[in-house]
Amino acid sequence: NMPAERERRMHSIHAYPAKFPAFITTKAIHKAEENNISVKTVADIFCGCGTVAFETVRSGKHFWGCDINPVATLIAETKSNVYQDGQLQDFFDRIIAAYKTYSVDKSNHIYSNERIQYWFDEEHIDNLLKLRSVIYLVVDDEFYRKFFLCAFSNILKSCSRWLTKSIKPQIDPKKQPKDVLSSYIYQVNMMRRANMENINEKYGEADIKRTNILDVNIDKPFVDLIVTS
């Protein structure tokens, strides 16, 4: 049965291919508990962007997951945490202020990267490098830095020459890439609204690793339920 409740906004903070419906996780947990299985820890060994991670911690349970894709684990970690909005606002204000005065280093190796030059024009390379640099400069708390890096990651496609509606890498010769700063402001504010939906709930904890499950040494069973795809 399809759930009556809509998916939380947190599931939409970053584009990611082949996401499955969030309710599969909660249905699996409920089904296991109906069959007298005590579910304290849920795992997703190909955790992707963290659909299972978010729904698990929302249920007040512990999550363990891994993926070899660093972008996937960044999104999953961001989704499965709750942030103080006042602290987000403070860091965000400082990022914007620093961005407006920061000068990029034209000797940075990024300018000699052929693939970067292929996807981005020089103005967008300048502004994206500036934004990424000030995120690392201003946000000294790694927990919050991941939130702002996740927002940065999600604007890259719209600020590039990549065909907007295509999952496969494809140049759109007619595309006008979006402005970096306005795109980032919109993205962060959207993510803050998503975070506010979760602010007063008691969440479980998530343990997310960037690794291949085949490389993980498991001495004994440590999870009660695996939900993966």
Locate the predicted segments by residue.
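S-adenosyl-L-methionine
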Residues: 1-36
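SAM-dependent nucleic-acid methyltransferase catalytic core
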Residues: 125-228
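Short, charged/polar micro-motifs that form catalytic or ligand-binding hotspots
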Residues: 11-15, 66, 118, 138
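Short linear capping/connector segments at secondary-structure termini
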Residues: 5-7, 109-114, 166-172
